[in-house]
Structure formats: C-alpha cells, structure tokens
C-alpha cells in the first residue's frame, strides 16, 4: 500500500458538459499509457493584490486564485488509434470542453479530477522517442466546487464524491 499517489498513472478522458464531468462510467475512456514521467499537474499561484500606504506599510492584501495545467505526452504508435478528441484538433486546438481523471496504480491513494478544461495538442518528432503528441489541458472553473478535486479511487468514481 502506497502513501503517495506517484509513479505510473492511469489517465481518463470524457467530454465536459455544462461545466461538469459526466457521472456515467461508460462516458469515461482510459487513455493510452503516457510517456514515462511526462504526466504532471502544475499549479500557478494567482496574482496578488496589495494595498500599501505611504512608507510601504500594507493596509490590505488579497490573494488571487490559482490556475492549473495538466500536461502529458502520448506516443503515436503504429497500428494504434489516437483518441478521437485528439484527432479533431485543428492546428493544435481541440474543440469543446474536456474532463480528466488521474488515478495512481495504487487505488488506496487519492485520485485527481478536473471537470472542465480546454485542450491544445502539439506534435513533435525525435529519433529518441519517435512521434509524440504533447497534450496541454488548461483547467477552467467547473459548474460547482474547486477547479481541481480529489477523490477516493478505491470506490467507483462518482463526481459528487469529489472534494
């Protein structure tokens, strides 16, 4: 039993509808295994606002909300189809809004849910890795709750259980 939700992960995708992730399990599709160590969720601190008076003393302070970006690389393998939402990209822009789940191989650790995101993809090629599709999902404020949520992967996924 792990303590951290690190290491190899399973990624799932679904279309986001009206700012929410679908509740039906059949609407979620597992993505191909990403390139090793390419999956990461990055948090960017919000812009701070500080009111200062003459002399530099702080009168008030208001922190801005964080923003989140999920990134991962998928190999373009011979004989394997890329997910259809990736193939619909026009010059790198994937139409629609998307939801993502990140689950550790060890289901005793917390899983991550992004209910609403916009996506872009970038193709690259190297002799080391072949053709890679770099996926960048910029998380948007969902219909309810926090932009990034955590849930218990041991039980069947239910968006309403995400906190």
Residue ranges and their predicted role:
Residues 83-111:
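Short, acidic/charged, Gly/Pro-enriched secondary-structure junctions
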Residues 18-19, 81-92, 147, 152-161:
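Short secondary-structure boundary segments
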Residues 19-20, 79-81, 105-113, 145-147:
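Short, surface-exposed beta-strand/loop "edge" segments at domain boundaries and coil↔beta transitions
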Residues 14, 101-105, 140:
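A generic structural motif
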Residues 69-73, 99-101, 134-138:
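Beta-strand secondary-structure signal
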Residues 1-77, 116-130:
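Solvent-exposed edge beta-strands and adjacent loop segments
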Residues 110-163:
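Mixed-charge, glycine-accented linear interaction segment located at domain edges/termini
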């Amino acid at each position: 039993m792990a303590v951290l939700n690190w290491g190899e992960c399973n990624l799932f995708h679904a279309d986001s509808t009206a700012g929410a992730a679908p509740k039906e399990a059949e609407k979620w599709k597992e993505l191909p295994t990403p390139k090793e160590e390419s999956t990461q969720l990055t948090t960017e601190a919000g812009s701070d606002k500080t009111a200062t008076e003459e002399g530099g003393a702080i009168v008030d302070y208001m922190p801005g909300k964080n923003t989140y970006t999920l990134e991962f690389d998928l190999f373009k393998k011979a004989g394997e189809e890329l997910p259809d939402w990736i193939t619909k990209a026009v010059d790198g822009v994937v139409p629609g809004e998307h939801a993502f789940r990140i689950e550790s191989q060890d289901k005793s650790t917390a899983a991550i849910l992004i209910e609403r995101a916009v996506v872009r993809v970038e193709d690259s090629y190297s002799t080391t890795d072949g053709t890679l599709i770099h996926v960048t999902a910029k998380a948007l404020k969902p219909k309810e709750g926090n932009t990034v949520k955590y849930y218990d992967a041991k039980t069947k996924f239910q968006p309403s259980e995400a906190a």
